[in-house]
């Protein structure tokens, strides 16, 4: 991934710089998240855009037809540039790196929350408030994942900190406590 990061970072930094200068960084970040969801959920799109058979002009035309109406001009220009330079295969890395940089400069903590079932709005808000205290910032972005194999509870990862409030985690801690007694 380091090579991909060295390719992605200059493009990400440029997009962020232009978006910040135009006052569109939050809008661009939201568009990046939406495009990432589409990219990750559509193998057909990924395969077509990373295909060596499809010419850069065809890729660019397809991307513009699909996304130009919904994206800021800076974001649209990034897609064109990646297509022109035959770097569209690095799109996911560029977008992920953009979000990292955006969160860094806006001091937004990313909390990955894995739960056994989807959380309701009240649970999300309560969790967000607790994470704000742990992360030391009022800006918290939740990335919610559902893993039914957890049975119950949740696990929160913020940076290098992990809070395991899962049923399996509680059983494991209980087992360790009993092992120390015996």
Swiss-Prot record:
Species per Swiss-Prot/TrEMBL record: Paulinella chromatophora
Gene Ontology terms, MF aspect: proton-transporting ATP synthase activity, rotational mechanism
InterPro entries the UniProt entry points to: ATP_synth_OSCP/delta_N_sf (IPR026015), ATPase_OSCP/dsu (IPR000711)
Quaternary structure annotation from Swiss-Prot or TrEMBL: F-type ATPases have 2 components, F(1) - the catalytic core - and F(0) - the membrane proton channel. F(1) has five subunits: alpha(3), beta(3), gamma(1), delta(1), epsilon(1). CF(0) has four main subunits: a(1), b(1), b'(1) and c(10-14). The alpha and beta chains form an alternating ring which encloses part of the gamma chain. F(1) is attached to F(0) by a central stalk formed by the gamma and epsilon chains, while a peripheral stalk is formed by the delta, b and b' chains.
Topology versus the membrane: Peripheral membrane protein
Entry keyword set: ATP synthesis, CF(1), Hydrogen ion transport, Ion transport, Membrane, Organellar chromatophore, Plastid, Thylakoid, Transport
Family: Belongs to the ATPase delta chain family.
Protein name in UniProt: ATP synthase subunit delta, organellar chromatophore
Short name of one Pfam family: OSCP
PANTHER family reported in the protein's UniProt record: ATP SYNTHASE DELTA CHAIN (PTHR11910)
Places the protein is found: Plastid, Organellar chromatophore thylakoid membrane
Principal subcellular localisation of the protein: plastid
Function of the protein: F(1)F(0) ATP synthase produces ATP from ADP in the presence of a proton or sodium gradient. F-type ATPases consist of two structural domains, F(1) containing the extramembraneous catalytic core and F(0) containing the membrane proton channel, linked together by a central stalk and a peripheral stalk. During catalysis, ATP synthesis in the catalytic domain of F(1) is coupled via a rotary mechanism of the central stalk subunits to proton translocation.
CC annotations in GO: organellar chromatophore thylakoid membrane; plastid; proton-transporting ATP synthase complex
């Amino acid at each position: 991934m380091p090579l991909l990061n060295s390719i992605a970072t200059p493009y990400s930094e440029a997009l962020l710089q232009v978006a910040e200068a135009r006052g569109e960084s939050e809008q661009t970040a939201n568009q990046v998240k939406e495009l990432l969801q589409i990219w990750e959920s559509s193998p057909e799109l990924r395969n077509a855009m990373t295909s060596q058979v499809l010419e850069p002009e065809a890729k660019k035309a397809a991307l513009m037809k699909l996304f130009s109406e919904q994206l800021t001009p800076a974001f649209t220009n990034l897609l064109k540039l990646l297509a022109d330079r035959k770097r569209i295969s690095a799109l996911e890395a560029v977008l992920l790196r953009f979000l990292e940089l955006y969160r860094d400069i806006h001091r937004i903590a990313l909390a990955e929350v894995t739960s056994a079932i989807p959380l309701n709005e009240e649970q999300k808000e309560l969790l967000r408030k607790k994470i704000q205290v742990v992360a030391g910032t009022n800006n918290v972005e939740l990335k919610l994942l559902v893993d039914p194999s957890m049975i119950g509870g949740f696990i929160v990862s913020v940076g290098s900190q992990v809070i395991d409030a899962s049923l399996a985690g509680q059983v494991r801690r209980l087992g360790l406590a009993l092992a120390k007694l015996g």
